[in-house]
């Protein structure tokens, strides 16, 4: 007989064994009956001991560790949802440690609504890796002032902390497999769901912690990959051209800027300063330039 769960947590991973252990420990410490949820982790061919972790991990809740060839985040998550037994899915990441009330909060949100609804929780980024986290050294990824239950735009469909009925995901065909690099596969699904009038609501009590510090230099490099994925998004939804940053002014500035010219050199010097307005401007410019280089090249 297929076990009955209220909610399935789906996580994709690749070479993240140490932090994944912390994440799984977080699900061991949930303030709810362990029989009402399952955790599915889909590994994309890790070589760091993740498979040993799968073999040794024996929690009270149902755990399913799956190993497959690397098909990107979309492939891992689609596989996880396909085997999930529950009618409701949480998508999160292998470096997102859940608050003890994380599962219960998502479950209660879906119990309380009669219509198929998606819920976006709160992910707290950490400025330094320390557990338990210091509240003074965390900040919300979503910084806007939002109210509990507030209806959100599709661009808030962020899969570090989002839940939805499995039936909606299946009806939409899941994450688009064309997105193999960094970013946009989640927002693209969110956009399709909003086109079908599926509501996305804010759930601030559903909290997890992003146990990973990304440096500004890493962000600048990563924005190239983000731009490359945005190019795929543009090909599927050309009506989003301006939302994706391709307004005439930004495109003109990019085309007039040489990657080895004086403007880039100046912005790099400003970015390397310790603080101040020039540092902020330099960092912002390099992030934007990297993103545009990904989407336009």
Predicted regions and their residues:
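A conserved acidic beta->alpha catalytic loop
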Residues: 26, 43-52, 93-96
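Acidic donor-binding loop at a coil-to-helix junction in glycosyltransferase catalytic cores
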Residues: 181-189
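N-proximal low-complexity "stem/linker" segments adjacent to membrane-targeting elements
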Residues: 1-29
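Glycine-rich, basic loop-to-helix element that forms the pyrophosphate-binding segment
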Residues: 68-84, 105
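Non-catalytic, C-terminal membrane-associated alpha-helical segments of glycosyltransferases
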Residues: 224-228, 243-297
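Short aromatic/hydrophobic "clamp" motif used to bind/position activated sugar donors
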Residues: 89
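Conserved donor NDP-sugar-binding/catalytic core segment of glycosyltransferases
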Residues: 101-134
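A recurrent flexible, glycine/aromatic-enriched loop bordering the glycosyltransferase active site
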Residues: 145-167, 180-182
């Amino acid at each position: 007989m297929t076990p009955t769960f209220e909610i399935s947590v789906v996580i994709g991973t690749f070479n993240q064994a140490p932090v994944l252990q912390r994440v799984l420990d977080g699900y061991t410490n949930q303030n709810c009956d362990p029989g009402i949820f399952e955790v599915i982790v889909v590994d994309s061919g890790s070589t760091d001991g993740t498979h040993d972790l799968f073999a040794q991990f024996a929690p009270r809740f149902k755990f399913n560790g799956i190993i497959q060839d690397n098909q990107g985040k979309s492939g891992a998550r689609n596989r996880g949802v396909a085997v999930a037994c529950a009618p409701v899915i949480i998508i999160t990441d292998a470096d997102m440690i859940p608050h003890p009330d994380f599962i219960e909060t998502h479950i209660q949100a879906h119990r309380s609504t009669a219509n198929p609804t998606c819920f976006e929780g709160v992910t707290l980024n950490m400025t330094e890796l320390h557990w338990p986290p210091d509240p003074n050294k965390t900040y919300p990824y979503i910084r806007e002032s939002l109210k509990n239950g507030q209806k959100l735009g599709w661009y808030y469909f962020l899969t570090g902390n989002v839940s939805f009925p499995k039936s909606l995901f299946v009806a939409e065909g899941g994450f688009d497999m064309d997105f193999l690099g960094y970013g946009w596969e989640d927002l693209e699904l969110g956009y399709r769901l909003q086109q079908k009038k599926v509501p996305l609501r804010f759930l601030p009590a559903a909290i997890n912690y992003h146990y990973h510090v990304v440096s500004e230099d890493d962000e600048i490099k990563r924005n190239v990959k983000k731009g490359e994925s945005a190019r795929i998004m543009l090909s599927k939804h050309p009506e989003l051209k301006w939302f994706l940053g391709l307004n005439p002014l930004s495109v003109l500035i990019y085309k007039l800027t040489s990657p080895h010219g004086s403007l880039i050199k100046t912005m790099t010097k400003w970015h390397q300063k310790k603080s101040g307005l020039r540092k902020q401007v330099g960092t912002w410019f390099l992030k934007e330039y990297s993103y545009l280089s990904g989407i336009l090249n």
